[in-house]
């Protein structure tokens, strides 16, 4: 499928405007359950009202950002070169990738040589250890990873959990077209 790539830096005003009214991979949990069933009720309705309001006004409000999230964004700048060197690949940073119709999108942390996307989480050390012990994409990020593949049309995604002074968790995920 055809996609549109917006080069705007993630979290910038231009990026927020490009996301206005778009159902994005990072928010798929508002419309689907972890078992990949359609959500019903207040959560879905609230999210869909937000997206409609964004379409009508042409703007998207910045979301809440904790200190841990800010630190995570900084650490992504360490994680990407680390992954590139370790795997001998080049990662293209992108702001937003939209489906051709503009209804769905994803903001991957990068595209690996146009064949896979990458989602990097740089959380707290205790969270990273939990991810390492699980050795798979944590349930709370699975919809985002599958949503990224849906929005970009890619068939492969890499989930990486990165924490300084610890081994990274790297999980390759294939697209599940049954979702």
Listing of model-derived features with the role each one plays in the protein:
Residues 83:
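Active-site region of the double-stranded beta-helix
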Residues 1-74:
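Charged, glycine-rich intrinsically disordered N-terminal tails and low-complexity linkers that flank
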Residues 69, 87-108, 112-179:
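Nucleic-acid nuclease catalytic cores
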């Amino acid at each position: 499928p055809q996609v549109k790539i917006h080069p705007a830096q993630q979290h910038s005003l231009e990026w927020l405007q490009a996301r206005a009214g778009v159902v994005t991979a990072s928010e798929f949990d508002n419309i689907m359950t972890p078992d990949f069933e359609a959500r019903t009720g207040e959560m879905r309705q609230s999210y869909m009202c937000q997206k409609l309001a964004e379409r009508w006004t042409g703007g998207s409000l910045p979301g809440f950002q904790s200190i841990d999230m800010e630190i995570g964004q900084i650490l992504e700048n360490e994680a990407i070169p680390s992954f590139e060197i370790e795997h001998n690949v080049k990662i293209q940073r992108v702001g937003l990738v939209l489906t051709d119709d503009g209804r769905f999108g994803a903001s991957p942390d990068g595209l690996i040589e146009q064949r896979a996307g990458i989602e990097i989480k740089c959380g707290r050390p205790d969270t990273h250890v939990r991810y390492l012990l699980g050795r798979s994409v944590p349930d709370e990020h699975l919809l985002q990873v599958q949503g990224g593949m849906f929005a970009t049309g890619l068939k492969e995604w890499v989930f990486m959990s990165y924490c300084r002074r610890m081994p990274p968790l790297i999980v390759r995920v294939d697209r599940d077209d049954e979702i």
